[in-house]
Amino acid sequence: MSEKTFLVEIGTEELPPKALRSLAESFAANFTAELDNAGLAHGTVQWFAAPRRLALKVANLAEAQPDREIEKRGPAIAQAFDAEGKPSKAAEGWARGCGITVDQAERLTTDKGEWLLYRAHVKGESTEALLPNMVATSLAKLPIPKLMRWGASDVHFVRPVHTVTLLLGDKVIPATILGIQSDRVIRGHRFMGEPEFTIDNADQYPEILRERGKVIADYEERKAKIKADAEEAARKIGGNADLSESLLEEVASLVEWPVVLTAKFEEKFLAVPAEALVYTMKGDQKYFPVYANDGKLLPNFIFVANIESKDPQQIISGNEKVVRPRLADAEFFFNTDRKKRLEDNLPRLQTVLFQQQLGTLRDKTDRIQALAGWIAEQIGADVNHATRAGLLSKCDLMTNMVFEFTDTQGVMGMHYARHDGEAEDVAVALNEQYQPRFAGDDLPSNPVACALAIADKMDTLAGIFGIGQHPKGDKDPFALRRAALGVLRIIVEKNLNLDLQTLTEEAVRLYGDKLTNANVVDDVIDFMLGRFRAWYQDEGYTVDTIQAVLARRPTRPADFDARMKAVSHFRTLDAAAALAAANKRVSNILAKSDEVLSDRVNASTLKEPEEIKLAMQVVVLRDKLEPYFAEGRYQDALVELAELREPVDAFFDKVMVMVDDKELRLNRLTMLEKLRELFLRVADISLLQ
């Protein structure tokens, strides 16, 4: 069977830059699934994405499905015919479904009986006939949150569509996709190259688009070119470009023919905190800031044009004129804000609502101040500095700079606090209170910052859960999942001596009578333990390991982490599987018994050597391991408990637990309960698979 290259390109108006990659990757994944489901042999499925196009190129695509033999088993002969040998309704219905009569059916005989059988040779359908529907289905499944309709048609897509190119080798596949009749026409760059041209063969893509249309269709190639050219441009001016991955992706999605240029701004603007300048350059203008080798911001920026100009200086000057007013605004806001102390903004917090039932930002500030001080006392941080940081924590939200450049919250608080002469750990805490902002983000760097960050997040968790507005489905308007994980990460990775139980109780207490959910403390703790589950799964721990620890509901995050590591290590021991199975057996035996057990094993009642030996080892280990449990040495404890494998195996091999003698039975059940209690001091290992 011959093979050909297949090309599909959807030419559109400008696609959303932040969604471009995901649209292209989903298109490729969807179409690959369609090919595989149809049984069409194919090679690599390569995706292309530019601001005004999505495309796929499939190598070595078979021209048709392979022929195949199908078999459909019908009713058993006993049910297929009545006593007179006439076909039953079941047999006739089955035959109609196969497109035959009962007389035409074959017989299938096995050692289990005889059945009606339909066999047929099905010729594979041509690829040309299958492709249009496969493309349409793949496009319909794209992750598009908001569809657009244009013109008088009812066609919906992420952006209006102008061209559809479907080529199998050199042949156009006739189809109407998204309201457009397919052909071999491709549109080039808006201002360079040929605005429109035809492509003779799918193998010519994407090179023909580069040569004639001045469009680099390969997304990764554009991105790599921007990165390399920007690094070289920065090197020429003695600096390093801030090429964050997210901005690189966005810029690569905005241009078809990237041309990297370097511009500058007035040095006087460097007196403004670099974060505000960078926010303007990256967030508003999509420019790449440039830093000196010592980490200081240079009065330069790198940007990417979408055209090769005969006069690039004109483009550079235009961009410099655009950015100057934004930088001047930042300078003005910075100078104006510093005319008063950060603390002077406190009264204005009373005018901003945090949440209707939970009060204003000033109310939240008071709670954070108190909770940060309480946390500082628990973890050995400076209580005065923590309460001071709590008092100032939201003051920068009332400044001109943060009002205009919202992403500078926190960092501007730090700069203004330093200007006011606040303690350095207080100033740093104002910046780091929102950390970690995302998975993998840095944690607060000092104890005061940790106390403030935890206090801010716990106040939000307690308040929102306290009024019954916990996250539902994928809706999480107060970012409670991120807040919970942030608290857990800080406590675990900084090894802080905090208990979720007392921490949540204190956060709830500070709300007074504002909360309506009587179960708020348990709800918050359960929610946070649930985030532990997600976190440890991401870290590579098995689900049953997590469940074994969760079963004990440890509320000290650092303690939870120690148990997780202990159980994970325990699983590597030779005795682990046998002891997990034994614990499961013990758990089942105890669950089936409703008899009241004694507090301790009666040694005089023990009879068999195996139970005597096991009882002695349980007693010895109980006393030996008590300091281990008290110190959180769970891994060492489980290693010691692994020594019980042989006596436990011997006990179950030789000793009957549920004997008729009540005293003996209860004594053996008590011993098993004491055995299980030892393991439960760490985790419920009966849940290990």
Curated annotation (Swiss-Prot):
Recorded hits in InterPro entries, A to Z, give:
DALR_anticod-bd, Gly-tRNA-synth_bsu, Gly-tRNA-synth_heterodimer
Q: Which GO terms describe its cellular component?
A: cytosol
Look up the EC number in the record and give it.
6.1.1.14
What catalytic activity does the UniProt entry give for this protein?
tRNA(Gly) + glycine + ATP = glycyl-tRNA(Gly) + AMP + diphosphate
Please state which protein family the record places this protein in. Answer: Belongs to the class-II aminoacyl-tRNA synthetase family.
**What is the annotated quaternary arrangement, including any partners?**
Tetramer of two alpha and two beta subunits.
Tell me what this protein is called: Glycine--tRNA ligase beta subunit
Which species does this protein come from? Escherichia coli O139:H28 (strain E24377A / ETEC)
